[in-house]
Amino acid sequence: MRNSLKNIFLIVFVSIISLGLYQYYQNYSEARSFNNFLDSAALVSSLHLEASEEFKNLLDFSEISREEFENKIDKVVSNSKEAYEIINNTDASLTLKEKELLSLATSYWLQGLEMFEVSIITLIDNPNSEKIQESIAQSISDLSIGDRSYSEFLFLTKQNATSEGTFLPVLYEIEYVGLEDNSFRFADLLVEKAKSSTGGLFLVRNLSISGAEFKPNPIAITEEDYSVLL
């Protein structure tokens, strides 16, 4: 009888220890995966902080040339693509609401920035383009969705970062256009700003004068049939 009780006690004790060790491993594994995700999120945040600040400067349009605009928007889109790749290369088995929100943000940001770049270049090449405001408005709408998704990601991440074993890196507040209620009005304002630019935004690149031909008109004809030029 004593041996039976002793064996039962031993089995219960071993089971409790095993369960505790398993739970500890599970918590450790989840914390490590979450920390790895946060490291990637910090890179994404840093890239989009730089891109969003440059993008806001571009929206001024006041004294920027076409070449400067193209170089800067290329850098902004490049940063966005890099951030998109980083978040999509994270552990596919990781199912987190935070990851879902950040993935949504990077996707809409990239989509909006690429459409914005194409739309403004189209406007520059053809200032009388019809319905250009629609594509610009769509890009603004996409950027706004990205801003909102990132804001929710940031809130949720900070809320859950209090868990034991979680190390919260620097995650920046990022906003491209904010919560824009009227993207079409925003687009109209951007088109007006762009068209009033004084920095050479609408100058055509790689356009040069290869030669000039002087064809003066005569102002009089002499009796000897010679033309008198001014």
List each language-model region with its residue ranges.
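Solvent-exposed N-terminal domain segments of exported/luminal and surface proteins
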Residues: 123-127
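Transmembrane signal-anchor/signal-peptide helices with a preference for the extracytoplasmic
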Residues: 14-39
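Intrinsically disordered, low-complexity Ser/Thr/Pro-rich tracts
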Residues: 31-38, 45, 179-191, 212
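Alpha-helical segments in soluble extracytoplasmic regions
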Residues: 39-121, 131-153
